[in-house]
Every structure is written in C-alpha cells, then in structure tokens.
Amino acid sequence: MAVSFLRIPIPSRVFWYPTRLIRVTPALLRFSSSAAFQPSSTSLSPPSSDNFLADKWESYRKKKVVIRIGYVGTDYRGLQIQRDDPSIKTIEGELEVAIYKAGGIRDSNYGDLHKIGWARSSRTDKGVHSLATSISLKMEIPETAWKDDPQGTVLAKCISKHLPENIRVFSVLPSNRRFDPRRECTLRKYSYLLPVDVLGIKNSFTSDEIDYHITDFNEILKEFEGEYPFHNYTQRSRYRRKSEQKIKQRNGRPPREPKSIKASESEFREENHIEIGEEEEEKEVDGESDEHVVTPDSDNSQVYSRAKWLYEPDETDKISGAHFRKVFRCRSGKLENSLGFGFVEISIWGESFMLHQIRKMIGTAVAVKRELLPRDIIRLSLNKFTRIVLPLAPSEVLILRGNSFEVRRLPERPGMEATGESEEVEKEIEEFYRAVMVPQVSIFLDSEKSPWKEWVDHLDRNDGLIDEELEDVRKGWEEWKAAKPWMNLKKTEDDEEALSSVSVPIHQAL
C-alpha cells in the first residue's frame, strides 16, 4: 500500500476563476464566506482579568477588521456562540473571551456581538474543522496596529495567547467598512478525508487495484460537477420562501415587483446562504436523511417513500433558484496514509454550499461505490422533479480549506491588488495543521471505530431504494429528457466550460 502523509495547505499565490483573475486585497482578507451573526439579547459580565492584564493592549480607536482563524472542532458544539446555555463550548465563545482579554472588546460591548458587528465565514457543526474561517468585527486596536506588521500577526499572537491549543488566530487585517465576505466570496474549498476501507480498498490490494478503485470512485464524484438543484442534498424547507408570508402594502399600494425573477431568486439565494454543517439539533439517526418523501395514499393517508418523481407540481415542496448550487470540482486524490490509516482526500470546490450538502454528496458517492445505490442515482437526484432520500456522511473529517473573493466594483471602492498570504502566515497555518489538526483528525480515519463502523453498518442495512420507486423515477426522467432534447447539448457545453475553468493549476484558495 502506498504511503504518504496528510498534505499541508499549499501556499497560495493566485487563483484563476473561470474568466478572470480573482483579485483580493490584503486590507480585506482573502478567505471566507460569511453568515451574519444573529444578535443575542443576553449580555455577559466580563471575565476575571487577574491573569492577562500584562498581555492586554491599550485601545487607540475602533476599526473594522477581519480575523482568520483555524480550529479543530472535535471538542466544540460548532462555531456559533450559544448564549442560552453558557455551558456549551463553542469556537466563538472562546474567541470572544480571547479578544476581550487582549483588549479588542470594551467592557460595555462584551457579551453582545451585535454591538461590534460580528460576522462569520461559516457556521460549522460539531466535529467540522477549519483552516480558513474568518470573523469580521469592529475591534478596538492599539496605536501601533499593523506598523511593520501588515498581516497583523502580532495582534493575532496576542489573541492566540488567550485561546486553547486547538484554536489559533493566524492574522488580523484591516477591512473596508462595506466589505461583505459572504456576498463577495466566489469560491469555497472543502476537503473530506475518507478512509479507503469504506470504498472496499484493502491492505492486500496491489497498486493497480488501488488505482482502479480510486479512478472508479472519481468517475462517480465527477457527476456532481456543474450547476444543478441540490435539493435532495439538504433540508429543502430552509431554502424555500414562505408561501403564507404576506408583504405589507405601503400607502395603500401593492409592493413593487422585483426587476426580474432571476434577480429575485439570486437575492434570496444570497440571503439564505447557510454554510455546510450549520449547528443545529440533528434529526438524523445514524446518517439517515432528515427529510422524507411523502406520498398521499388512496385512503388519504400519508405513505413515506424514499424516491419519487413529481409528475405534477407540489405546492408544499417547491424548488427554486435558491436550491441551485454550482460545483466546480469534486475529485478524490491518491491514496495517503496517516498513523497507519489509509485514506483519500476529496476536494469539493463550489460557489456556496447548503446545509449538509457536502456530507450527503460524499454519503451518496460511497453508497454508489459500495453498490448500495445505482450508478444513475446522482444524475436522477440532480433533477428538480425528483425527491430522493440520500445518506449523510460523518462530519468529523470535513475541513474548510480556503476561500476566494472577487471584490465588488463600487465607485467609492477602487480595484484591489492581488496578493497571497505572507510567508509568516503560511508558516503559522502549516504549523497548526501539522502539530494540532493532523493528530486529532487522524483518529477518525480508523474505519473499525466510531463514527465509521456504525455509519457503514447502517448504510449497508438501510440505504437501498425500492425497485418500484426507482423505476418510476427513471421513467419520469426519461420522459422529461425526451421532451427536452436541447438539454443534452447544453449539458455537454456546460461540462466543457466547467472543465476548462479548472484545467489550470489551482493553488490553495485563500
């Protein structure tokens, strides 16, 4: 069996987007999608200051900044702070205290992140890790901030002194007041580390046999590349407009219609972007989907099915532009080894991802490889007329690797120059990845232990589809395809364009 080590983040220089070079400024930060923080009405008292005053800077003024952080999410209940239950450990809870102790938050603002304009790059669930999460806020800064330190590494190290070992601040950069990392992020890059035993690759396999299985798995993963409705890979209701919601009339006149349906859907999609793995009380049991397909029976009772084709519109289960996502890359790397466990690193790059989307993509691909689901299930599931229940893979080996931005062109905001991370920041990220993240993530690469053993056992028992339901879906898909012959030509053209957009060497996106 081939042996190598977990790869460290590749230093970034530039990133080629489909038609242009993405240009980002060091004054803004080159990584992250952001979801605005929801303000809490609960306020906290500042923590005891007995042991940190020597490490606390003196505030000179308040400035909007963007902080890049990395963390191992194993010991935390996700990123987002939980005001209702202070006993719940979160990344933001630790970070807020550390910034306060370093001098970045005033006593009067501590405990209310809304006051300081706190926004995050992702709301990761427990077990999800990151090397490229960004937090933006209006922070109290010292007079010497960024003097001979353009990446803000001195500020970063001061904050990191007050953080546990599994959370690290890499840089603190000044930000334009109008910079919106969520809206201006054009690419998000994730990695998923998958034990090869799950794919059926054994220690006794020859190199040729290993290459065959990985190549075959890549053919399955490539089916996800392109722009499709990924409604079967998330909780659909989270991305659906409320049909009962009424817009109040202004001055006795009906509200203005949006300029276009496309523009309206785009705005809704942006406002409802939920990063992969958002913290919530999971309703899944052992990886089962949390959203069933309901079919009315002849006696008006409800029957739960696992696969269905909608021959008629379902007003209670609409699919809109908010359910569409563009995936630029979904590929597996070669066999690697860490602590004696063989694994492959799956790279998933896209504009944005919905709740559970990546984990369901991985779970479905594994089920296809294990011959529990048919080869055409991915193609069928990416059609807006299908409703299919798909498996959800574990979260413990999902890592946010990086993001890219395209700064919006506004009259008061001139163009930005492209730069990569400084060598000092790259070194800090590499050190954290090797010394902290790798040892802790590697323990989840043992397919004979949790979470993989339970997940695979459940997958093998429960994730097949009823033949009659599947045949009905295929029949509906064939009729739909026959009615739209131009779709085949468009699909070919889209595939060629997508491949050309990622054919150039792509470095770690920041």
Swiss-Prot record:
Q: Identify the enzyme class.
A: isomerase
Q: Where is the composition biased (Acidic residues)?
A: 277-289
Residues the entry annotates as binding substrate = 190
> Catalytic activity, per the record?
a uridine in tRNA = a pseudouridine in tRNA
Record's keyword terms, sorted = Isomerase, tRNA processing
Record field: compositional bias (Basic and acidic residues): 254-276
EC no. given is 5.4.99.-
Q: Does the keyword Isomerase apply?
A: yes
Q: Which GO terms describe its molecular function?
A: pseudouridine synthase activity; RNA binding; tRNA pseudouridine synthase activity
Q: Which superkingdom is the protein from?
A: Eukaryota
Q: Where is the active site?
A: 125 (nucleophile)
Enumerate the Gene Ontology biological process terms.
Answer: tRNA pseudouridine synthesis
Pfam families, per database record: PseudoU_synth_1
Q: Which family does it belong to?
A: Belongs to the tRNA pseudouridine synthase TruA family.
**By what name is this protein known?**
Putative tRNA pseudouridine synthase
